[in-house]
UniProtKB/Swiss-Prot annotation:
Cofactor needs: [4Fe-4S] cluster
One GO process term, biological-process aspect: protein histidyl modification to diphthamide
Organism encoding this protein: Emericella nidulans (strain FGSC A4 / ATCC 38163 / CBS 112.46 / NRRL 194 / M139)
Assembly and oligomerization: Component of the 2-(3-amino-3-carboxypropyl)histidine synthase complex composed of dph1, dph2, dph3 and a NADH-dependent reductase, predominantly cbr1.
Family: Belongs to the DPH1/DPH2 family. DPH2 subfamily.
Gene3D superfamilies attached to this UniProt entry: Diphthamide synthesis DPH1/DPH2 domain 1, Diphthamide synthesis DPH1/DPH2 domain 3
Residues annotated as binding [4Fe-4S] cluster: 135, 156, 373
Region annotated Disordered, chain positions: 416-467
Record has Zinc as a keyword: no
GO molecular function: 2-(3-amino-3-carboxypropyl)histidine synthase activity; 4 iron, 4 sulfur cluster binding; metal ion binding
Subcellular location: Cytoplasm
Main localization, broad class: cytoplasm
Protein known as: 2-(3-amino-3-carboxypropyl)histidine synthase subunit 2
């Protein structure tokens, strides 16, 4: 026998739950660093030296989430260091004023003293980053009008657009004896060509590892150093002189990498070096660690499968995932032009930190292109509903089936795409020869016939993943007929006579007669077409749609007056003034 509820069940979170103890978002470190260890880890002396030399006044400190607990102590160390320097400078300048000097030296010292009084640096700790923690957050730094950003932790080293940066990679301890033992077991032949590299947080150990291996008898080693060049043969690392002269000779070298590298680096080097061995640093101390051979075959095959899936996508979304990397606006324009040249439509989005929930709201988009740093552009997650690719992968996806050849080469830095020379025409003189001679009329007539029969004569496109025929993969090419040579020659005559002759007018009339394409402001919109044909719910506001001249449905009902609906709770509703419950 069931009992009736005296009150409705509680379906919300209690108000006092916020006062209860919850798990911390950032895990606590095992131990608190001493002041000396903190100064070494965060490179306080070098940071103070660079701030004093450049005389920065407003300094922004950017920490990743795992280093935020140390941010107040780092702030105090930097503040005390700058104040102590000011006191020392003031005392030294006061002593020099008592010494006999000539007028020129005395005036110069007074100018220096005036500058020292005006130079009062201020430090700011940036809160949450707008994008990835590996990138410099110039947007947050501009909120405090910063002159420089001190970036802590690992970084992608992408060049910034506006502000100078002081990189502090922090120092991490690394036992060298296990590293040397693992290296000798992996490469027993001392003549093997091996490049030594490490993650940026362990890069300061590379010179010591190199010197000790040379003492062991290894003669064909190269120790990399950090450089700010993501477009390098080895991104952000120096390479041997022989590789600078002939980049393809990098295939004769093997790579020994300390700590787990980012996936973008592995994919980039997979086709450039002979082999990659990774020395893990996340294992327990005191245990024998064996380097693991890197294998990127599965990841590369999955990336290529994504490209074949996107070859027939009609609408692309451009995700701007950075506002700080240099030349990001140029690559946005480049990607937009490439998509438009392929007859497809693109929409641009600025979403901040990328996650699956944000991009899932736009079901019209068939694929996403990320514009970001060379590390964050690679999004290899299965949580996203639609594929997310890089600008390099877009170049491959937009090629035809007969041109798309997957060689295994992969790159994530978009600057290398911008540096590529523009494609040259096969025969530069053809355009001039076509406009001369009596056969120009026949040539123009052939172009007119091609323009009229373009949709019918275009080769069919199939989705290589499903095998289905795709009839709507290039909506912008079909909706915007190209202008033939005869149309350009008779443009003035058509304007004077007001005639609507030519194949373009016939095609435009045929398109309007079909009524299959959604128009917004007399312009074809693939997004509106998707909303009209595939979405079952178009949202509220039919009056607004009519006023904006947006036609989604020819059978759309007119708006009606607002009437009183149901009211009550889930146990029973009443309609209008009726007392009956439903």
């Amino acid at each position: 026998m069931t009992t009736e509820l005296a009150a409705a069940p509680v379906l919300s979170t209690p108000d006092d739950r916020i006062l209860e103890e919850t798990d911390p978002v950032v895990p606590q470190t095992n131990r608190i660093l001493s002041e000396e260890e903190l100064a070494i880890t965060y490179d306080i002396e070098r940071t103070l030296k660079e701030i004093r030399q450049a005389r920065y006044k407003r300094i922004a400190l950017q920490f990743p989430d795992e280093m935020l607990p140390d941010a107040p102590r780092v702030f105090q160390l930097l503040s005390r260091g700058l104040e102590a320097r000011d006191i020392v400078d003031g005392g030294s300048k006061a002593n020099t004023e008592t010494e006999p000097t000539d007028g020129l030296v005395d005036s110069a010292s007074r100018l220096d003293l005036k500058d020292a009084d005006e130079w009062s640096p201020k430090l700011y700790i940036l809160a949450d980053t707008s994008y990835g923690t590996c990138c410099v957050d110039e947007v947050a730094a501009e909120h405090v009008d910063a002159d420089v950003v001190v970036h802590y932790g690992r970084s992608c080293l992408s060049p910034t657009a506006r502000l100078p940066v002081i990189y502090v990679f922090t120092h991490k301890e690394l036992p060298l004896d296990p590293v040397l033992k693992a290296f000798k077991e992996t490469y027993p032949d001392p003549e093997t060509k091996v490049i030594l590299a490490a993650d940026v947080t362990y890069s300061d150990h590379i010179p010591e590892v190199y010197s000790r291996l040379v003492q062991e008898g290894y003669s064909s080693l190269f120790a990399t150093a950090l450089v700010h060049d993501p477009s390098s043969v080895i991104p952000n690392r120096t390479v041997p002189d022989s590789v600078k002269e002939a980049p393809e000779s990098l295939g004769n070298w093997q790579l020994f990498h300390i700590s787990e590298p980012p996936t973008a680096l592995l994919l980039t080097l997979a086709s450039r070096v002979a082999a990659i061995h990774i020395y893990p640093t996340d294992g327990p101390a005191g245990t024998d660690v064996k380097p693991l051979p890197a294998s990127t075959a599965m990841v590369l095959r999955r990336r290529y499968a994504i490209l074949t899936r996107l070859s027939t996508v009609p609408i692309f979304g451009i995700l701007v995932n950075t506002l700080s990397v240099k030349n990001y606006l140029h690559i946005v324009d480049h990607v937009r032009d490439k998509i438009a040249a392929a007859g497809k439509k693109s929409y641009m989005f600025v979403v901040g930190k990328l996650n699956a929930a944000k991009v899932a709201n736009f079901s019209e988009i068939g694929g996403w292109v990320v514009i970001g740093c060379w590390e964050s552009s690679l999004v290899d997650s299965k949580d996203f509903w639609k594929p997310v690719i890089t600008p390099f992968e877009l170049e491959v996806a937009l090629k035809g089936d007969e041109e798309r050849v997957w060689t295994g080469a992969w790159q994530s830095d978009f600057q290398s795409i911008l540096d590529q020379p523009p494609p040259s025409s096969n025969s530069p003189g053809n355009s001039q020869e076509a406009n001369e001679g009596p056969e120009f009329g026949d040539h123009a007539r052939d172009e007119d016939e091609d323009a009229m029969s373009e949709p019918e004569s275009a080769p069919p496109e199939f989705d290589l993943r499903t095998g289905r025929y795709v009839s709507y993969s290039r909506p912008m090419r079909d909706s915007a007929p190209r202008v033939s040579a005869s149309q350009g020659a008779t443009a003035a005559i058509s304007a004077q006579t007001g005639a609507a002759d030519g194949p373009s007018a016939a095609r435009a009339l045929a398109r309007r007669a079909k009524g299959d394409l959604a128009m917004v402001g007399n312009t074809f919109s693939p997004g509106a077409e998707f909303l009209r044909s595939q979405r079952t719910w178009t949202g509220l506001g039919s009056d607004f749609n009519s006023a904006a001249n947006v036609e989604y449905d020819d059978e759309e009902n007119d708006s009606t007056l607002v009437v009183q609906g149901r009211k009550g709770i889930a146990r029973g509703y009443t309609v209008g003034d009726s007392i009956d419950r439903h």
